[in-house]
Curated annotation (Swiss-Prot):
Family: Belongs to the bacterial ribosomal protein bL31 family. Type A subfamily.
GO cellular component, one term: ribonucleoprotein complex
Subunit structure: Part of the 50S ribosomal subunit.
Protein origin, superkingdom: Bacteria
Keywords: Ribonucleoprotein, Ribosomal protein, RNA-binding, rRNA-binding
The species this protein was found in: Rippkaea orientalis (strain PCC 8801 / RF-1)
Name of protein: Large ribosomal subunit protein bL31
């Protein structure tokens, strides 16, 4: 028997929302789940190629590792100190 008042609320018809439209329903502990990419618009499933830059990943990579090919210094590891 599960303990009372320790389990999250279960929503058997939780809505998956992509670009403001409900794309599917699933069971979840949240009533609504907002996603940017799902199987209906993912390039692998649709057969199209497009660049997806989520939260500036490319910019972050260029900032961190962009100067390595130009003779720049390597980034420090977390434990290394100068």
């Amino acid at each position: 028997m599960p303990k009372a008042d320790i389990h999250p609320t279960w929503y058997p018809e939780a809505k998956i929302i992509c670009n403001g439209e409900v794309v599917m329903t699933v069971g979840s502990t949240q009533p609504e789940i907002h996603v940017e990419v799902w199987s209906g618009n993912h390039p692998f499933y649709t057969g199209t190629q497009k660049m997806i830059d989520t939260e500036g990943r490319i910019d972050r990579f260029q900032k961190r590792y962009g100067n390595l090919g130009k003779g720049g210094s390597k980034p420090n590891k977390k434990g290394d100190q100068k």
